[in-house]
Amino acid sequence: MLFPSISDTDEITRITLTRPTIGDDLPDVLGVFALSSADGMDDLPKQSPRPTPLLVEHSEDVFLRPGIRGQRVSVDSLGSLLAGTAWSPRFVVSNTFGDEDHLTIDAKDDDAQLALRTELETLKGGTLRVRHTLTNTGDSEYLLDALNVHVPLSDDLTEIMDFTGRHEHERDPQRRAIADGTWLRECRYGRPGFEGQIMVAGTPGFDFGHGRVMLVQLAWSGNSTLEVDRNSSDEAGINAGELLSPSEVTLGKDESYSTPWVMITASNAGLDGISASLHTWQRSLPEHPAKQPVILNVWEGVMFDHNLDRLLEIARRAARIGVERYVLDDGWFHLRRDDHAGLGDWWVDPDVWPEGLTPLVDAVHKLGMEFGLWFEPEMVNPDSDFYRE
C-alpha cells in the first residue's frame, strides 16, 4: 500500500506500508521516501533493511526501544496492589478507513484490553504527520510511561544532526554517525528549549543543497523525547513523542491519550528541500494570507521608564515612518520597576499608569496603528503578589 496517493509533481514525502488487513498485526513501514517527480516510483531510495511498524512492539520481535511503555494496575480482594501486566501488548488491526490525504488504522489487543488508533495525514508540500491514540478498554487503570511514533531509517541514512544551544547561541547543530545503541535527546523545560525538537537523518555529508535527508519533528510545545535507536541487526529508526513524568498519564476505563503530531519531511536535495516542504504547508494555512505588520517594540527606547508623553512622541514618529503595530514592552504591570520584581502580577500598575493604558492605546489607534502588549506568562519573580499568594 502506498500512502498518500500521488497528487503533486513536486518533491513529496511518501510512506509505504504493508496492507493493513483486519485481524493482522500492525502494518510494517517499508520505507519513507521523497520523490523528485511523480514518475519516480521506479527509482525509490533504499528501504529499511527490515520493515518495522509505526509503533515498535517487542511482541513482533523488533527489539528496539518499545514504542509503548506502561502497565496495568489494580487492587485485589485483599487490597494488595497488582501491577506488571499488559506491558508488552500485541495489537491487531480491527478497522481501517481514509481518503487520498488521510489514513486511520484502528487496532486492539483484547488480552491487554488496549485499543490503538494511528492517524496519518499528508500536508500540502509533502510533509506527512502521524500520531497515536491509546485507549484503555479494561476496568483497571493503565499507567502509561511512553507512547512514541517510530519512523524507520533506510540503511543509507547513516548520519544524524540535531541541535543544542543557549541564550544568544541558539540552534547550534551537532552531527554524528549513527552507531549501535540509542542517541537520546530530551526536553524537560516544559516548553521547547533552544535546541528544539528536531532530528535530521541523512546520507553522509548532507548539507543545505545536497544529500538525501529526512526530518522528524514534534509539533508540540511541552516536554519531548527524540531518540535514534539502532540494534546489532541494523534495524534503525527515530522515535518521537511526549516525555511523560511518572504517573502523569493514568488511563481509567475508556480514557484515551494522544501523542503530539509527529512531522516527517524528506528531501533528495538536502536541508533546503525539507525547509521548502514545511514552508509550503505553513503558507497553505488559513492564517497565512494575513498581512504581517511592521512592528515597533519600545523596549530599547524606554526600558522601564514609562512616561506617557515620551511614549506618545514615539508613537507619532512610528506612524510617520509606516509602523503598523506599536508594542508596549516590559514595565507596565504591578511592581515592575526593574527586572527583580513583578513578574506574575499581570495588571496595570496604577502608580505608573494612573489613568490605565487607555490614553496610550487610544492615541495609537487614532494614529492608525494596532496596539500590542508584552507579557511573559511562564515567568514569575519571588517579589510579586502572585508568588507570595
Task: Enumerate the predicted regions with their spans.
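Short coil/turn motifs at secondary-structure junctions
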Residues: 123, 137-139, 266-267, 378-380
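Short Pro-Gly-centered flexible turn/kink motifs
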Residues: 249-268
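Long, charged amphipathic helices and adjacent flexible linkers at domain junctions
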Residues: 277-289, 294
